[in-house]
């Protein structure tokens, strides 16, 4: 059967470049992996004739490019200080000291940076003069919603994480839709559904009573007009582009203005550098294992590094490990350490047998794209939810960094390497991921063009954002039905009692009016009263 996908993609491209737009992107103040996705997207938008501007703090590292321009501002972080901040939090994670208080501290850094942006009048006035057509918000840092409101520009959400926010408004039955950070699948028993409900309620209360009010106080501080709540701003997004995919995510209800665009960084493997090519080509007998924890490589504790080195050294496969820092003392002879490696190109090599990863979303999509089985040791954020899905789909095994032993790690690696079901599932998920209309980055630019062409595409937005809590859950209908049921109960009860009393009265009168088979009407000696006269009646002998 002839495929028409290339023709559709060509049509999308032709329509998309009909009008060049000015787009501003507000990335999170931390996490370089998020910025890397946005840079890839900016390059794709540039190819379609759009001009993209990044709003970044001074000192934050980013490669120069003619595909985008930069608008700098004095923020709370630069690349060095944000990295130091993350390292301190990661040390607390590995030592078990990351408490709720420190999570609030992370949020405070986000809102302090937002305050610095909103209060910078020179910055804001300069941005207003640019007259942007669209602003892209990463919900990991909700200041983007505030900036969009301040500039009076249309905005859409581009989530660089696995998160499917409840703020989207899509139905999320807790019986089979696992809440973010619940580490649950769509197959839950009673206790798991109880846990899912608890995580959902805590999450909703945290967002409603902690996160959103912090940003609302910033808007009140600077008297942003027209006055709007953060709740309304978050729900006012024209489109939600989520970095997930039907191959990875559990099936769930969604809405027309929600699109899956996970896998933006995926691409075919390119030729390896000559030295690496010789190294992987020499692993034909047993193959090789790739080890990479992404940007988290610098955060690994010495204890975890030693566990990894011990388990990897026992494998018959060769091992190439992206690593920086002090070399583990128990490093095996089969293991090659390297500070940077072409991860995507190694994943696409025919001799690869498994991937040991932290479960970062970008890495998992590259792994899925090439059909490679995974052993994941999540570190923080959405790593846990990502690996939960990988394990549930049969593509890999999830291990907990704080409980895993060297032996358990070795057993998990041996299992995914020697059990063909893991590779088969990985290859099947690769087929599903690729069997969609166009590459994820092309789908993303198509939808961005779509909302630009249709002035925000309000026709895609559900009315769920215009109804109250009581209306959504039909509490008003339930109240009326309950009121009707109560009223009906009292009416039926009253009528029943009334009929009962009448019947009882008639029966009582009938009983007292009949004696020995004769009707007496209450008059002794056989007399009865009729028409006001006393009459006599002969008794029948």
Swiss-Prot record:
SUPFAM superfamilies in UniProt: UDP-Glycosyltransferase/glycogen phosphorylase
Protein's pathway: Sphingolipid metabolism; galactosylceramide biosynthesis
Chief localization: membrane
Pfam families for this protein: UDPGT
PROSITE patterns tied to this protein: UDPGT
MF-aspect GO terms: N-acylsphingosine galactosyltransferase activity; UDP-galactose:glucosylceramide beta-1,4-galactosyltransferase activity
GO BP terms: cytoskeleton organization; galactosylceramide biosynthetic process; glycosphingolipid biosynthetic process; myelination; neuron projection morphogenesis; paranodal junction assembly; protein localization to paranode region of axon; response to immobilization stress
Tissue specificity remark: Brain, restricted to the oligodendrocyte-containing cell layers of cerebrum and cerebellum.
Keyword Transmembrane: yes
Record: glycosylation sites: 78, 333, 442
Compartments, as annotated in UniProt: Membrane; Endoplasmic reticulum
Signal sequence bounds: 1-20
Catalytic function, reaction form: an N-acylsphing-4-enine + UDP-alpha-D-galactose = a beta-D-galactosyl-(1<->1')-N-acylsphing-4-enine + UDP + H(+); N-(2-hydroxy-hexanoyl)-sphing-4-enine + UDP-alpha-D-galactose = N-(2-hydroxy-hexanoyl)-beta-D-galactosyl-sphing-4-enine + UDP + H(+); N-(2-hydroxy-hexanoyl)-sphinganine + UDP-alpha-D-galactose = N-(2-hydroxyhexanoyl)-beta-D-galactosylsphinganine + UDP + H(+); an N-acyl-sphingoid base + UDP-alpha-D-galactose = a D-galactosylceramide + UDP + H(+)
A single Gene Ontology CC term: endoplasmic reticulum
EC numbers for this chain: 2.4.1.47
Keywords: Endoplasmic reticulum, Glycoprotein, Glycosyltransferase, Lipid metabolism, Membrane, Signal, Sphingolipid metabolism, Transferase, Transmembrane, Transmembrane helix
Membrane topology label: Single-pass membrane protein
Function in brief: Catalyzes the transfer of galactose to ceramide, a key enzymatic step in the biosynthesis of galactocerebrosides, which are abundant sphingolipids of the myelin membrane of the central nervous system and peripheral nervous system. Galactosylates both hydroxy- and non-hydroxy fatty acid-containing ceramides and diglycerides.
Matches recorded under PANTHER family: 2-HYDROXYACYLSPHINGOSINE 1-BETA-GALACTOSYLTRANSFERASE, EG:EG0003.4 PROTEIN-RELATED
Name of the protein this chain belongs to: 2-hydroxyacylsphingosine 1-beta-galactosyltransferase
Gene symbol of the encoding locus: Ugt8
């Amino acid at each position: 059967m002839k495929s028409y996908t290339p023709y559709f993609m060509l049509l999308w491209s032709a329509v998309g470049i009909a009008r060049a737009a000015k787009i501003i992107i507000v990335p999170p103040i931390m996490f370089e992996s998020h910025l890397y996705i946005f840079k890839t997207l900016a390059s794709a938008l540039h190819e379609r004739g759009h001009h993209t501007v990044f709003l970044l703090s001074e000192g934050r590292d980013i490669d120069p490019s003619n595909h985008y321009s930069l608008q700098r501002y004095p923020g709370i972080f630069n690349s060095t200080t944000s990295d130091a901040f993350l390292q301190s939090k990661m040390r607390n994670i590995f030592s078990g000291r990351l408490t709720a208080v420190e999570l609030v501290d992370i949020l405070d850094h986000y809102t302090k940076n937002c305050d610095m942006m909103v209060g910078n009048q020179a910055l804001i006035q300069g941005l207003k003069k640019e007259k942007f057509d669209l602003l892209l918000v990463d919900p990991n840092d909700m200041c983007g919603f505030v900036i969009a409101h301040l500039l009076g520009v249309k905005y859409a959400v581009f989530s660089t994480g696995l998160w499917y926010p409840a703020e989207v408004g899509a139905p999320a039955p807790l019986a089979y839709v696992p809440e973010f950070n619940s580490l649950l699948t769509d197959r839950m028993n009673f206790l798991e559904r109880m846990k899912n409900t608890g995580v959902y309620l805590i999450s909703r209360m945290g967002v409603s009573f902690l996160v959103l009010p912090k940003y609302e106080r910033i808007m009140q501080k600077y008297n942003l007009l027209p006055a709007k709540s953060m709740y309304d701003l978050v729900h006012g997004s024209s489109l939600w582009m989520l970095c997930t995919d039907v191959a990875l995510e559990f099936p769930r209800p969604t809405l027309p203005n929600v699109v899956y665009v996970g896998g933006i960084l995926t691409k075919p493997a390119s030729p390896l550098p000559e030295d690496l090519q010789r190294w992987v080509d020499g692993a034909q007998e047993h193959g090789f294992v790739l080890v990479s924890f992404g940007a988290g490589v610098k955060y690994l504790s010495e204890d975890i590094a030693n566990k990894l080195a011990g388990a990897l050294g026992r494998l018959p496969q060769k091992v190439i490990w992206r690593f920086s820092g002090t070399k583990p003392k128990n490093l095996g002879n089969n293991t090659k350490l390297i500070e940077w490696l072409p991860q995507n190109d190694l994943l696409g090599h025919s001799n690869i047998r498994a991937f040991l990863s932290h479960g970062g979303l970008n890495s998992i999509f590259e792994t899925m794209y090439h059909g490679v089985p995974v052993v994941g040791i999540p570190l923080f954020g959405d790593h846990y939810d990502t690996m939960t899905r990988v394990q549930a789909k049969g593509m890999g095994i999830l291990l907990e960094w704080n409980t895993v032993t060297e032996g358990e790690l070795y057993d998990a690696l041996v299992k995914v390497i020697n059990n063909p079901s893991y590779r088969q599932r990985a290859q099947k998920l690769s087929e599903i991921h690729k069997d969609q209309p166009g590459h994820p980055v092309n789908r993303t630019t198509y939808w961005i063009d779509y909302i630009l062409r249709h002035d925000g595409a309000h026709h895609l937005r559900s009315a769920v954002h215009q109804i109250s809590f009581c209306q959504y859950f039909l509490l008003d209908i339930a109240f009326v039905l309950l009121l009707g049921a109560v009223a009906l109960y009292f009416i039926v009860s009253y009528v029943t009692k009334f009929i009962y009393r009448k019947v009882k009265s008639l029966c009582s009168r009938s009983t007292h009016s009949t004696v020995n088979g004769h009707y007496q009407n209450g008059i002794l000696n056989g007399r009865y009263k009729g028409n006001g006269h006393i009459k006599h009646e002969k008794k029948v002998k």
